[in-house]
Amino acid sequence: MCGSQPGENGSLREGRGPGMPGPYRVAMKKGEDDLQSYLEQAFGKSDVTSVKMRAAVREWFDLYYGVPRAGEDTAPRVAALIVGKLCRTVFAEYETRLPPEAPDPLRRSLSALNAAAKTAMQYALVGGECLLKPVPRDGAFDFAAIRRDCYVPLARDAHGSLLAVGTMERHSVDGRQYALLERRTAGADGLTIETRLFELNGQTLGRCVPLATLPACAELVPQLVLPGVQGVGLAVLKTPLMNCVDGSTDAVSIYAPAAGLLHALARCEEQLNAEFANGASRVFASEDLLRPDAQGRRALQDDLFVGLPDDPANVGVTVYSPALREGSYLARKQDLLRGCESLLGLRRGILSEVETPAEPRTATEIAATSVDYDLTIRDLQSAWTDTVQQAMALCSALGAVYGLDGLPQTAAPAIDWGDGVLYDRARIWAEQRELVDAGLLRPELALAWYFDLPHETEAELGEIRRRFMGDAGRAQ
């Protein structure tokens, strides 16, 4: 079935690693243009993303992958630093739990989703949106993350949800190039998947060939309807930011508000490099000291400075070491980094220096930046929680269509994010125990809070007493 084909997330990066500068950007941009053109020719549908938004998506990936740009030094890779730090913090204490009676296929599907979590989150932080495709495997589901520049939105509703999406896979067999194009369309009767296979003719789409032409596509059908599957059959992870590019409902990169500052940082780094290059010590010599070499080029002799007197000026040689002005450039760099932290809701010191003697900060300022950072992380964790719910619902719906057992409709894992940036779990647990000791709180409720257990009914409270309270619980 078409819904069981993995690998489409890598189709536009064939033969190139994700960190390749220069040629990677050219190849990826060309791949984006090919994808849009091919889908329009095959299905008569074009990308609904605005031109301004498409340019912004390319810019975000340029910033992340450090694509060279005139007048900028991309070596610091601040965008990659932002994404890496946020992703690590979001999943630092991430844990999912299923009820003890949950079937094995459900557990394996959730484990596969967790394995793709960090990749999907980083794709979403860079491109604003990432799709997770459920792929049937051994009676359960695996998940393939598809980043923003590897699919084309063909239709969206008023809230920005995908109503149709196109993807492409490239295949090479016996020296011939093929493009497998897929369009997913949401409908009232379920999900419709249309698949076309084309033999590429140079840079053009070429002719449509039967799907059985390639062994990898032999089991596909030109059109497939999956009843009961909502949306486009893909879980969606979006960044929780308002669109600051064109005002549309498209999701934006986590560092989209600071894109201008990131370019300014790259220019500042280039200027700082030039400052150090210009600050190298130089020797100025009189022209009459130059001698032609074997190629006729005039240069100083190797033994010129043998026996140089105490005063070099007497022999026409001057040593010059210009003073460096790196202080002003470094101060400007720190100012730009602090601006990025403020725009993106990062704690002070994540990107910039924690504190400089010239700019002491008050406890209120420190607390304010910590609160902003905590809210940023919570927003991202909430976005992933919603994606997990979507993915588990898709597994249940697709499992019913494919005839897979062990994927109940009510599969909803409990997610524990740990203490968070500001949350002090130990302090609250100590307060709970004080309330229990004072007789103001039932110990079952305190244990239910600590272990995140259901506690709405007497039966659930009785189960807590049985598991944790021993003889004291049975006495009650």
Model regions and ranges:
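C-terminal structured domain segments
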Residues: 423-445
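Surface-exposed loop-to-helix/strand elements on domain peripheries
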Residues: 106, 308-427, 465-472
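Extended, charged amphipathic alpha-helical segments
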Residues: 215-368
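Long, highly charged low-complexity segments enriched in Glu/Asp and Lys/Arg with interspersed Ser/Thr
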Residues: 454-475
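Extended, helix-rich architectural segments
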Residues: 2-162, 475-476
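Long amphipathic alpha-helical coiled-coil segments
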Residues: 393-401, 439-458
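Short coil/turn segments at secondary-structure boundaries
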Residues: 277-283, 350-356, 410-411, 444-451, ...
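Extended, regular secondary-structure scaffolds
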Residues: 133-247
